From Swiss-Prot:
GO terms for biological process: [2Fe-2S] cluster assembly; protein complex oligomerization; protein folding. HAMAP family: HscB. GO terms for cellular component: iron-sulfur cluster transfer complex. Interacts with HscA and stimulates its ATPase activity. This is Co-chaperone protein HscB homolog. InterPro entries: DnaJ_domain (IPR001623), HscB (IPR004640), HscB_C_sf (IPR036386), HscB_oligo_C (IPR009073), J_dom_sf (IPR036869). Pfam families: HSCB_C.
Amino acid sequence: MNHFELFGLPNQFELDGGLLSAQFLELQKRFHPDNFATSSERDRLLSVQKAAQINDAYQTLKNPVTRAEYILSEQGHDIRGEQTTMQDPMFLMQQMELREDLEDLLSSSDPESALFDFSENVSAMRKTQLAELKQQLESELWQEAAQSVRKLKFIDKLNQEVEKLEDKLLG
C-alpha cells in the first residue's frame, strides 16, 4: 500500500491538504499504540509500526517537494538523498546572484523593506516552479519533474536563508 492509498487519496501531485490532515488524524487515532496496550505483543508491535508508517507518509505527502520526490520514486526515478549536481547553469547563476543580493540587503538603506521584497520574489519563484512541476508530473515528464524538484530544493534553501536573515534583522 503506497502513501496515497494509506490516506485514501488519489495518486496525484495535487491533493486536498484538509482531507490529508483529517485522514491523518483519523488514522493516528485508530492505530495509536495506547489503543493496543492490552493486546498481544505482536499486535502492539504492529500498531507501533503502523503509527510510524502513518507519520512518515503524512510528513512525505504534506510537503509538495517530498510529495513529488515520492511520486517520482514510485515511477522508478528515486532522487531522494541523491547528490546529483544541478545541470542548469542559468538557474545556478541566478541562485548565486540571489544569494549575493541577499547578503547585500543588510547594507541597504531599508533592509526590512528590501528583505520583504526579496522574500516576495523568492515566493513567486517557488510558486512558478511548483506550477511547472505539477504540469510535468501530470504529463509524466519524469526527468523534467526531477529537475524541477532539484530547483525547488535550491529555492527552499534560499527561503531558509531569508528566514534566518529576517530573524537576525527583527530579533
